[in-house]
């Protein structure tokens, strides 16, 4: 009797120890995600959700990671609202079963959560937020990154190189209108520096607006008074459409050269025929010809979701905007999973070291190379300037020679 009790007690202690170490709970590899799944800017968050779910399905179809299936254990909606993002991130960080995190769909909510995510230490994938301070708190890309943060965004210092070069070589009196977020404010500094580095003049006028602004009369009127010969704009698609309509209403007939937000469905839907002539910067992954990894992703996305809003209007060809609304999330998830596979561990330090060892990874948006100092993936050689043109009665985007 005593022997039985002793054996039983030993078993119970062993089970308790196993449970406390997570051995019983770790039947799946769990990730957490907060993004703008609904709300006025859900083209980013919902697009990323679709991409991450596709990546999870593909890995699980091959047996998961080292024999364990992947699970999106927490998928939370922040509507691109910083306060909601903070609440969501706290919930995710409180769940100690979460192995890796995929962050919000914009600089505002991301900056609201990034310090707590860094302090937590688990691998954090930044799919979209463009301000470099998300990854490099000293704001100098390639130096002293946050230890656990990896970026798949088109950083606005990278975007500014292509945008500034085009503006400097084509216009003399440039006006800049930007959103008032960290993305917009830092973007102006990078853009102005890029214009001047390429031999152009400092912008003659600068103004800002709040995300969701319904009227930009004051901003456009200021540009008109400054006699600009082009407007450079940094913002999201819905807001850039308001800007373009305001330019038309006030008869300011100058080119609009915009950040990547102008190349997506929200801008096209909001600006209509006024999109013609608009120029914008974008990762060129979905231009022709596509690399094999990009073409394979496009085929898999179309098979799962069809030619939906994120695919775009052309049933045969995905829109360029997928690179910053969908496939960035796909690449972020795949690099996280590849890091876990290489590490053969779910310990944060092991996964981070494994991701830093990744070289020559064929992603959708880029070929990724990470290191201890390099935690971002997109470089200037992958960014191009595109223009809305009309061919055969249809409005389409085409790359321009620089």
Q: Which functions belong to the PLM regions below?
A:
Residues 1-11:
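Bacterial N-terminal signal peptides that target proteins for export
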Residues 43-50, 62-139, 152, 209-216, ...:
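Beta-alpha junction/loop-to-helix N-cap segments that form part of ligand/metal-binding clefts
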Residues 32-53, 75-83, 105-106, 177-185, ...:
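Extracytoplasmic "Venus flytrap"
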Residues 11-14, 24:
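Cleavable N-terminal signal peptides
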Residues 247-330, 384, 388-389, 395-400:
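Extracellular/periplasmic periplasmic-binding protein-like sensory domains
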């Amino acid at each position: 009797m005593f022997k039985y009790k002793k054996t039983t007690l030993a078993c119970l202690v062993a089970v308790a120890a196993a449970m406390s170490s997570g051995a019983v709970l770790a039947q799946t590899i769990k990730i957490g995600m907060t993004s703008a799944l609904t709300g006025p800017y859900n083209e980013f968050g919902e697009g990323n959700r679709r991409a991450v779910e596709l990546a999870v399905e593909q890995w699980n179809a091959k047996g998961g990671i080292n024999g364990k299936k992947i699970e999106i254990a927490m998928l939370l909606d922040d509507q691109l609202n910083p306060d909601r993002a903070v609440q969501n991130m706290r919930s995710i960080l409180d769940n100690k079963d979460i192995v890796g995190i995929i962050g919000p769909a914009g600089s505002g909510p991301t900056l609201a959560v990034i310090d707590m995510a860094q302090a937590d230490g688990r691998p954090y994938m930044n799919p979209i937020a463009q301000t470099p301070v998300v990854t490099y708190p000293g704001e100098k890309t390639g130096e002293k990154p946050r230890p656990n943060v990896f970026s798949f965004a088109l950083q606005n210092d990278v975007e500014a190189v292509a945008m500034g070069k085009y503006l400097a070589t084509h216009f003399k009196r440039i006006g800049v209108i930007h959103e008032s977020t960290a993305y917009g404010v830092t973007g102006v500094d990078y853009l102005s520096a890029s214009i001047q580095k390429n031999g152009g003049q400092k912008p003659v006028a600068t103004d800002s607006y709040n995300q969701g602004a319904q009227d930009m009369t004051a901003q456009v009127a200021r540009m008109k008074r400054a006699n600009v010969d082009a407007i450079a704009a940094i913002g999201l698609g819905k807001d850039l459409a308001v800007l373009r309509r305001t330019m038309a209403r006030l008869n300011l007939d100058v080119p609009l050269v915009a950040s990547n937000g102008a190349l997506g469905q929200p801008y096209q839907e909001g600006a209509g025929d006024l999109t013609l002539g608009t120029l914008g910067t974008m990762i060129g992954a979905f231009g022709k010809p596509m690399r094999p990894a990009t073409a394979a992703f496009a085929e898999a996305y179309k098979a799962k979701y069809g030619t939906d809003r994120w695919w775009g209007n052309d049933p045969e060809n995905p829109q360029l905007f997928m690179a910053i609304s969908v496939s960035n999330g796909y690449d972020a998830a795949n690099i996280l999973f590849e890091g876990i596979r290489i590490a053969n561990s779910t310990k944060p330090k092991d996964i981070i070291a494994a991701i830093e060892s990744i070289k020559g990874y064929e992603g959708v948006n880029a070929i990724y190379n990470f290191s201890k100092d390099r935690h971002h993936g997109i470089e200037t050689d992958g960014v191009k300037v595109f223009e809305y043109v009309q061919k055969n009665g249809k409005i389409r985007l085409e790359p321009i020679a620089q």
